[in-house]
Protein backbone atom coordinates (compact mmCIF):
# COMPACT_ATOMS: atom_id res chain seq x y z
CA UNK A 1 0.00 0.00 0.00
CA UNK A 2 1.37 3.39 -1.01
CA UNK A 3 2.02 5.97 1.69
CA UNK A 4 0.25 8.65 -0.32
CA UNK A 5 -2.42 8.58 -3.02
CA UNK A 6 -2.53 10.28 -6.40
CA UNK A 7 -5.75 11.97 -5.27
CA UNK A 8 -4.07 13.51 -2.22
CA UNK A 9 -1.22 14.79 -4.36
CA UNK A 10 -3.57 16.30 -6.93
CA UNK A 11 -5.74 17.98 -4.30
CA UNK A 12 -2.66 19.56 -2.70
CA UNK A 13 -1.36 20.81 -6.05
CA UNK A 14 1.84 18.79 -5.83
CA UNK A 15 1.83 18.39 -9.64
CA UNK A 16 2.35 22.06 -10.50
CA UNK A 17 5.97 22.84 -11.34
CA UNK A 18 7.53 26.14 -12.34
CA UNK A 19 7.20 28.06 -15.58
CA UNK A 20 8.89 26.15 -18.39
CA UNK A 21 11.51 28.86 -18.86
CA UNK A 22 12.64 28.43 -15.25
CA UNK A 23 13.22 24.69 -15.39
CA UNK A 24 16.34 22.67 -14.73
CA UNK A 25 16.75 20.21 -17.65
CA UNK A 26 17.98 17.58 -15.18
CA UNK A 27 14.37 17.38 -13.92
CA UNK A 28 13.08 16.36 -17.38
CA UNK A 29 12.56 12.72 -16.42
CA UNK A 30 10.21 13.75 -13.59
CA UNK A 31 8.03 15.98 -15.78
CA UNK A 32 4.79 14.54 -17.20
CA UNK A 33 3.79 17.34 -19.56
CA UNK A 34 3.55 21.10 -20.03
CA UNK A 35 0.35 23.12 -19.78
CA UNK A 36 0.09 26.83 -20.54
CA UNK A 37 3.77 27.45 -19.92
CA UNK A 38 3.86 25.44 -16.67
CA UNK A 39 5.62 22.13 -16.23
CA UNK A 40 3.47 19.38 -14.71
CA UNK A 41 5.21 16.87 -12.47
CA UNK A 42 4.68 13.15 -13.11
CA UNK A 43 2.76 12.16 -9.98
CA UNK A 44 3.03 8.44 -10.70
CA UNK A 45 6.74 8.84 -10.02
CA UNK A 46 6.07 11.06 -7.01
CA UNK A 47 3.86 8.38 -5.42
CA UNK A 48 6.67 5.82 -5.72
CA UNK A 49 9.37 8.24 -4.61
CA UNK A 50 7.41 9.31 -1.54
CA UNK A 51 7.30 5.59 -0.66
CA UNK A 52 11.08 5.37 -1.06
CA UNK A 53 11.66 8.51 1.02
CA UNK A 54 9.22 7.30 3.69
CA UNK A 55 11.03 3.99 4.02
CA UNK A 56 14.44 5.70 4.12
CA UNK A 57 13.35 8.09 6.88
CA UNK A 58 11.47 5.38 8.80
CA UNK A 59 14.55 3.15 8.79
CA UNK A 60 16.77 6.03 9.91
CA UNK A 61 14.41 6.86 12.78
CA UNK A 62 14.27 3.19 13.80
CA UNK A 63 18.05 3.41 14.19
CA UNK A 64 17.79 6.48 16.45
CA UNK A 65 18.80 8.98 13.79
CA UNK A 66 18.77 12.70 14.49
CA UNK A 67 16.73 14.23 11.66
CA UNK A 68 16.77 17.92 10.79
CA UNK A 69 13.89 19.54 8.86
CA UNK A 70 14.87 22.60 6.81
CA UNK A 71 12.52 25.04 5.07
CA UNK A 72 13.08 28.77 5.40
CA UNK A 73 10.67 30.12 2.77
CA UNK A 74 7.40 31.48 4.11
CA UNK A 75 5.33 28.71 2.48
CA UNK A 76 7.35 26.08 4.37
CA UNK A 77 8.19 27.67 7.72
CA UNK A 78 5.06 26.69 9.65
CA UNK A 79 4.79 23.12 8.34
CA UNK A 80 8.49 22.45 8.92
CA UNK A 81 8.29 23.60 12.55
CA UNK A 82 5.01 21.80 13.30
CA UNK A 83 5.91 18.47 11.71
CA UNK A 84 9.46 18.32 13.06
CA UNK A 85 8.10 19.03 16.54
CA UNK A 86 5.34 16.43 16.14
CA UNK A 87 7.97 13.87 15.21
CA UNK A 88 10.21 14.82 18.13
CA UNK A 89 12.93 16.12 15.81
CA UNK A 90 14.55 19.44 14.97
CA UNK A 91 14.11 22.25 12.45
CA UNK A 92 15.45 25.43 10.90
CA UNK A 93 12.68 27.55 9.41
CA UNK A 94 13.91 31.14 9.23
CA UNK A 95 17.40 31.51 7.85
CA UNK A 96 20.15 28.95 7.41
CA UNK A 97 23.20 30.32 9.20
CA UNK A 98 26.33 29.47 7.21
CA UNK A 99 28.33 26.86 9.12
CA UNK A 100 25.32 25.39 10.95
CA UNK A 101 26.72 21.94 10.13
CA UNK A 102 30.32 22.58 9.09
CA UNK A 103 31.00 24.87 12.05
CA UNK A 104 28.82 23.07 14.59
CA UNK A 105 31.05 23.92 17.55
CA UNK A 106 30.43 27.64 17.03
CA UNK A 107 26.69 27.04 16.66
CA UNK A 108 26.75 25.05 19.91
CA UNK A 109 28.26 28.07 21.68
CA UNK A 110 25.41 30.26 20.43
CA UNK A 111 22.89 27.68 21.62
CA UNK A 112 24.62 27.61 25.01
CA UNK A 113 24.26 31.39 25.16
CA UNK A 114 20.54 31.10 24.41
CA UNK A 115 20.12 28.60 27.24
CA UNK A 116 22.17 30.83 29.56
CA UNK A 117 19.89 33.82 28.94
CA UNK A 118 16.80 31.66 29.52
CA UNK A 119 18.28 30.42 32.79
CA UNK A 120 19.02 33.99 33.89
CA UNK A 121 15.35 34.82 33.50
CA UNK A 122 14.22 31.62 35.23
CA UNK A 123 16.48 32.00 38.28
CA UNK A 124 15.58 35.64 38.90
CA UNK A 125 18.80 37.24 37.63
CA UNK A 126 16.76 39.54 35.38
CA UNK A 127 15.11 41.05 38.47
CA UNK A 128 18.40 42.43 39.82
CA UNK A 129 19.80 43.68 36.51
CA UNK A 130 19.27 47.19 35.11
CA UNK A 131 16.26 47.40 32.79
CA UNK A 132 18.48 48.45 29.90
CA UNK A 133 20.61 45.33 30.26
CA UNK A 134 17.52 43.10 30.50
CA UNK A 135 16.16 44.68 27.32
CA UNK A 136 19.41 43.89 25.50
CA UNK A 137 19.38 40.32 26.78
CA UNK A 138 15.78 39.86 25.65
CA UNK A 139 16.66 41.18 22.21
CA UNK A 140 19.60 38.79 22.00
CA UNK A 141 17.44 35.88 23.14
CA UNK A 142 14.73 36.66 20.58
CA UNK A 143 17.27 36.66 17.76
CA UNK A 144 18.91 33.43 18.93
CA UNK A 145 15.52 31.75 19.33
CA UNK A 146 14.44 32.81 15.86
CA UNK A 147 17.41 31.21 14.15
CA UNK A 148 18.40 28.44 16.58
CA UNK A 149 15.28 27.67 18.61
CA UNK A 150 14.44 24.66 16.45
CA UNK A 151 17.85 23.06 17.06
CA UNK A 152 18.30 24.20 20.66
CA UNK A 153 18.07 20.62 21.95
CA UNK A 154 19.63 18.86 18.95
CA UNK A 155 22.25 16.59 20.55
CA UNK A 156 24.64 16.39 17.60
CA UNK A 157 25.02 17.03 13.90
CA UNK A 158 22.01 15.38 12.20
CA UNK A 159 22.20 11.97 10.57
CA UNK A 160 19.62 12.89 7.90
CA UNK A 161 18.34 16.23 6.58
CA UNK A 162 14.91 16.75 5.02
CA UNK A 163 14.75 19.90 2.89
CA UNK A 164 11.88 21.81 1.33
CA UNK A 165 13.26 23.56 -1.79
CA UNK A 166 16.95 22.61 -2.12
CA UNK A 167 17.24 25.30 -4.82
CA UNK A 168 16.73 27.92 -2.11
CA UNK A 169 18.60 25.97 0.58
CA UNK A 170 21.78 25.45 -1.45
CA UNK A 171 24.09 26.28 1.45
CA UNK A 172 22.44 23.62 3.60
CA UNK A 173 22.76 21.08 0.77
CA UNK A 174 26.46 21.91 0.28
CA UNK A 175 27.21 21.58 4.00
CA UNK A 176 25.40 18.24 4.16
CA UNK A 177 27.29 16.96 1.11
CA UNK A 178 30.61 18.05 2.62
CA UNK A 179 29.89 16.05 5.77
CA UNK A 180 28.35 13.06 3.99
CA UNK A 181 24.90 13.61 5.50
CA UNK A 182 22.13 12.17 3.28
CA UNK A 183 19.57 14.68 2.03
CA UNK A 184 15.89 13.90 1.45
CA UNK A 185 14.15 16.74 -0.38
CA UNK A 186 11.06 18.05 -2.12
CA UNK A 187 12.54 18.87 -5.53
CA UNK A 188 10.64 21.21 -7.87
CA UNK A 189 11.23 21.53 -11.62
CA UNK A 190 13.75 24.37 -11.15
CA UNK A 191 16.13 22.44 -8.88
CA UNK A 192 19.17 20.23 -9.46
CA UNK A 193 18.25 16.66 -8.45
CA UNK A 194 21.86 15.47 -8.69
CA UNK A 195 22.63 17.06 -5.32
CA UNK A 196 19.87 15.13 -3.53
CA UNK A 197 20.17 11.57 -2.20
CA UNK A 198 16.44 10.83 -1.88
CA UNK A 199 14.31 12.85 -4.30
CA UNK A 200 10.61 13.68 -4.00
CA UNK A 201 9.54 15.47 -7.22
CA UNK A 202 6.99 17.99 -5.98
CA UNK A 203 5.69 21.53 -6.02
CA UNK A 204 7.60 23.18 -3.18
CA UNK A 205 5.80 26.53 -3.43
CA UNK A 206 2.25 25.60 -2.37
CA UNK A 207 1.59 25.54 1.38
CA UNK A 208 -0.73 22.50 1.10
CA UNK A 209 1.80 20.55 -0.95
CA UNK A 210 4.60 21.29 1.52
CA UNK A 211 2.37 20.34 4.47
CA UNK A 212 1.30 17.07 2.85
CA UNK A 213 4.78 15.80 1.99
CA UNK A 214 6.38 17.09 5.20
CA UNK A 215 3.68 15.43 7.31
CA UNK A 216 4.44 12.10 5.63
CA UNK A 217 8.11 12.44 6.56
CA UNK A 218 7.05 13.11 10.16
CA UNK A 219 4.77 10.05 10.04
CA UNK A 220 7.74 7.98 8.87
CA UNK A 221 9.79 9.11 11.87
CA UNK A 222 6.95 8.34 14.29
CA UNK A 223 6.53 4.88 12.76
CA UNK A 224 10.26 4.26 12.92
CA UNK A 225 10.33 5.23 16.58
CA UNK A 226 7.23 3.30 17.64
CA UNK A 227 7.02 0.32 15.30
CA UNK A 228 4.61 -0.56 12.51
CA UNK A 229 1.51 -1.04 14.66
CA UNK A 230 1.58 2.59 15.76
CA UNK A 231 1.62 3.82 12.19
CA UNK A 232 -1.83 2.51 11.25
CA UNK A 233 -3.38 5.93 11.83
CA UNK A 234 -0.98 7.54 9.39
CA UNK A 235 -1.37 5.13 6.48
CA UNK A 236 -4.18 5.96 4.09
CA UNK A 237 -5.33 3.73 1.27
CA UNK A 238 -3.88 4.90 -2.03
CA UNK A 239 -6.44 4.86 -4.84
CA UNK A 240 -5.28 3.37 -8.12
CA UNK A 241 -5.61 6.66 -9.95
CA UNK A 242 -4.68 6.61 -13.61
CA UNK A 243 -2.42 8.88 -15.59
CA UNK A 244 -5.56 9.90 -17.52
CA UNK A 245 -6.99 11.43 -14.34
CA UNK A 246 -3.90 13.61 -14.03
CA UNK A 247 -4.49 14.88 -17.56
CA UNK A 248 -8.12 15.66 -16.74
CA UNK A 249 -7.27 17.51 -13.55
CA UNK A 250 -4.37 19.39 -15.10
CA UNK A 251 -6.43 20.47 -18.09
CA UNK A 252 -9.27 21.48 -15.79
CA UNK A 253 -6.96 23.56 -13.61
CA UNK A 254 -5.40 25.32 -16.54
CA UNK A 255 -8.55 26.16 -18.52
UniProtKB/Swiss-Prot annotation:
Transmembrane annotation, as ranges: none
GO annotation (BP), single: translation
InterPro entries: Ribosomal_uS2, Ribosomal_uS2_bac/mit/plastid, Ribosomal_uS2_CS, Ribosomal_uS2_flav_dom_sf
Record's keyword annotation contains Ribonucleoprotein: yes
Molecular function terms, GO-annotated: structural constituent of ribosome
Pfam families the record matches: Ribosomal_S2 (PF00318)
Keywords for the protein's UniProt record, in alphabetical order: Ribonucleoprotein, Ribosomal protein
Cytoplasm listed as a keyword: no
Any one cellular-component term (Gene Ontology): cytosolic small ribosomal subunit
SUPFAM superfamilies tied to this protein: Ribosomal protein S2
Coiled coil feature spans: none
Family: Belongs to the universal ribosomal protein uS2 family.
Entry protein name: Small ribosomal subunit protein uS2
Organism name: Streptococcus thermophilus (strain ATCC BAA-250 / LMG 18311)
Lineage: Bacteria, Bacillati, Bacillota, Bacilli, Lactobacillales
Designated gene of the protein: rpsB
Amino acid sequence: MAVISMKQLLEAGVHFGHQTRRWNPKMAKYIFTERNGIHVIDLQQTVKMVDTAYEFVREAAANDAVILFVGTKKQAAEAVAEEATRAGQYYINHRWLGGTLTNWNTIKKRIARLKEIKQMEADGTFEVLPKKEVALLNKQRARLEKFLGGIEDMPRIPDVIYIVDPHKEQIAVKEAKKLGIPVVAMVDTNADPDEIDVIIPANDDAIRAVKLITSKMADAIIEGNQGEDASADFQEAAAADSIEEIVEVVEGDNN
